[in-house]
Amino acid sequence: MHVVRLSIHRLRRFHTVELHPSSTLNLLTGDNGAGKTSVLEALHLMAYGRSFRGRVRDGLIQQGANDLEVFVEWKEGNGAAGERTRRAGLRHRGQEWTGRLDGEDVAQLGALCAALAVVTFEPGSHVLISGGGEPRRRFLDWGLFHVEPDFLTMWRRYARALKQRNALLKQGAQPRMLDAWDHELAESGESLTSRRTRYLERLQERLVPVADAIAPALGLSALTFAPGWKRHEVSLADALLLARERDRQNGYTSQGPHRADWVPSFQALPGRDALSRGQAKLTALACLLAQAEDFAYERGEWPVIALDDLGSELDRHHQGRVLQRLASAPAQVLITATETPPGLADAGALLQQFHVEHGHITRQAAAH
């Protein structure tokens, strides 16, 4: 899939601006603070229902404005069914978020997230490796959400059961009142974990060659999954039963896929705790690119890839390796930088450049 029009209204420093990117490589340059990141942020907002830079109170809506709007038009599908155009709109005002997809109102923003797939690498992406388990669970679930149509229904089933069980635990409910929710949690949780396990195994097969291509010195060799309970010893139903009294005392569910995690392994490093910040960023980027490749294989088309502030996140050597990998893929890529990365110097006709300044985006003449 590739975006053909991105229209942004009253978001951060932009009042009204429109971007028509090419279907290959796109570079947005400009001084720090010019608004380059906000362009990718708008796209991310549509694809994830949240910003990668913090909450709305952090200045997402333009100062003095009451709302923001983002519109995206993109092409998708290139198989037997042919290519089709899709359109989505997102509006935020006060505490309300509303969305439209292909001319129809959506009941939940998840419909927009399911329609438009964007893989984003930004300055905070290192938390995928160096942070807590939540971003790593979210990473797994994003991949499954986009390649397995029934995954969201199953995920919601588990989340609902977990919420109900935790509410009963906080109330000090009698054990018999937990039985039904334990059954629901165990059944949906086992299924959720099986999907995550298979996905991570598949992802590992893609990740190792990707990491070797963009950062061979890392020696990234494997991904290890921790399901959230001792699954090799007991079923989730038994784990919940064994932990029931402790959970009643603590007021929350201590076992299950909501506690799952995964960790990368390296040939020459003791583990992720030994990674420098730069190594954590490279590992995170390798994971994101492997996920994009898996999406492309399963769906028959690439997601949009957004790389924010590439020059400050990676040194010239690794920039070159990443860009070489991306240039060989039929993916639409949007990159922001203060100046043209050396790795794009020879991109030629594949590269479309834009300049961002004073809340405006100017398309520059194509390179020859």
Curated annotation (Swiss-Prot):
Localization in the cell: Cytoplasm
Any single Gene Ontology cellular-component annotation: cytoplasm
Molecular function GO labels: ATP binding; single-stranded DNA binding
Gene3D superfamilies noted in UniProt: P-loop containing nucleotide triphosphate hydrolases, RecF/RecN/SMC, N-terminal domain
Any one GO biological process: double-strand break repair
Residue positions binding ATP: G30, D31, N32, G33, A34, G35, K36, T37
Name the record gives this protein: DNA replication and repair protein RecF
Organism field: Xanthomonas euvesicatoria pv. vesicatoria (strain 85-10)
